[in-house]
């Protein structure tokens, strides 16, 4: 009976450990709104090497994010996409919006290292993007809707 219970406990601990390691990937860091976290993760007006740009993201989460996309645009222009017609997001919600024209962006993919020395491969692209938008929170800029999630690039 003892080893049987130990096996169940080990499995539970393994599952909890896996959940804990994945959970922070999408969690908004304390003290930030969803829109501000979106801006930190995905807005980079000027071209910047992924290794440097990702350090700003990874410092909030204390781990190497596996992949991330930076839109080379200003927050105001990305927010304007929230006024485009609604489309269905990957999660089935109806609060997504597609950019009316393609933009320069950089896809960063983790290749090696350990936080804080994360190393990334840069992939420059010119594509449309789809963002999820929600009403702003109290401390967000005063727009009707603000981007809170980069759903995909197309």
From Swiss-Prot:
Site (Facilitates cleavage of polynucleotide substrates): 63
Signal peptide coordinates: 1-27
Tissue/organ expression: Kidney (at protein level).
Temperature dependence: Optimum temperature is 30 degrees Celsius. Activity declines with increasing temperature, with loss of stability at 90 degrees Celsius.
Database matches in SMART domains: RNAse_Pc
Function per UniProt: Ribonuclease which shows a preference for the pyrimidines uridine and cytosine. Has potent antimicrobial activity against a range of Gram-positive and Gram-negative bacteria, including P.aeruginosa, A.baumanii, M.luteus, S.aureus, E.faecalis, E.faecium, S.saprophyticus and E.coli. Causes loss of bacterial membrane integrity, and also promotes agglutination of Gram-negative bacteria. Probably contributes to urinary tract sterility. Bactericidal activity is independent of RNase activity.
Name recorded for this polypeptide: Ribonuclease K6
Species for this entry: Bos taurus (Bovine)
Gene that encodes it: RNASE6
